Amino acid sequence: MVKVALTASSVTALTLVLGLPTASAQQADDPTASGIAGLEEVIVTAQRRVESLQDAAIPVQTFDQDQMTQAGMESAQDLALLSPALGISAGGGPLTSFFVRGVGALTVNPLTDSAIAQNYDGVYLGRSSGAAGNALYDLERVELLKGPQGTLYGRNATGGVINYIPVKPMLGENSGFIQGEVGDYSKVGLQGAANIAVSDTVAIRVSGNSLDRDGYSDDDTNDQDSYSLRGQLLFEPNDKLSIRLSADYSKVDNVGPGGDLIGTYANPPLGEITDFTPSGLSENSGPTDPGANDIRTGVLHTPSFAPFQPIDQDDLYQDIDWTGYMAEVNYQTELGTLTFIPAYRESDQDYQFSGPGFAPAKTLEDNDQTTFELRFAT
């Protein structure tokens, strides 16, 4: 039996804001002038058009960057911390399954389609592994749509949809921020962004994120070592036309996940399974602990299989790259907005993971996708 131990870490964060802060949601007219306290109006695009969350006739939940930072979230795998409707089953490497209200894919095979559609900056991600490692940085919001949502998002949205929406360049504004955090397990995290107004019609935004943390396990498995970059350019020659170009890159290079051997059951050919026998290993010992290897090589095999071989940290690793390019062209007409989004995304994944109860599993996976979306919204 394998148990993955999750350990919470205390985090101290420091934020330095340069210029004007970027708001994560638009506000309605300020009613405080009349002495009446008001609520912030949350704007969503869950139905492919800009509208207030209160007006959206759809079950949707939103999270802004402040909420995700305060929750100590490190990647998209941590979104379940903010929503009881969202369940995330983290497998070895980037093999992660997403469930919304209990509906999702029951396999972590990277070749299968997910039942939860995930869109990064308006671009559909064809594989869940393309979203599981997403660093949550410089985001305007994350939208969780509870399914089914096949009408707007296609057949792979039976369980629901997750939209990752980055902060976009802002015309006429020079601003930015730098945020750092330190915590247990030698955790050091940095993220920041800079918005630069090139002219009255052109603006660029550059943002990035890095995270380095020792493993929660004693053998340094369940660690983090990643960084991400994103650059955007916005061109608005007039009130009707806007063109935005974006490129992003993410890198993960660490040991990866690991489990603890907490005990064994004996399963004889005849009779019932025997009582549970504790391993005697300490919590968070990890799969490469000498005691775990002793049990692997001496207990965890049957006459039908060869004995397990010892594993060490060199047998476990993740080396993963995600790259994306996209453009978004919006043209306003008297009847509505015409939007065209061409995009290309690719991932190169080389990872090997293991647990006390099975041999190291190596995966080489290369994905690339080209998409074109044309829509008209009123």
Q: Where are each of the predicted segments found?
A:
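Outer-membrane beta-barrel domain signature, strongest for Gram-negative TonB-dependent receptors
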Residues: 224-377
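Short, well-ordered secondary-structure micro-motifs
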Residues: 111, 190, 255-257
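Glutamine-centric residue-chemistry signal
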Residues: 26-27, 47, 54, 149, ...
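Structural signature of outer-membrane beta-barrel domains
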Residues: 49-51, 94, 105, 167, ...
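Outer-membrane beta-barrel translocator/receptor signature
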Residues: 113-115, 127, 137-146, 151-229, ...
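Acidic, small-polar-rich N-terminal luminal/periplasmic segments of exported/outer-membrane proteins
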Residues: 35-173
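Cleavable N-terminal targeting peptides that direct proteins into the secretory/outer-membrane pathway or into
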Residues: 1-34
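Short, acidic/hydrophobic/Gly-rich beta-strand patch recurrent on exposed beta strands
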Residues: 101, 207, 341
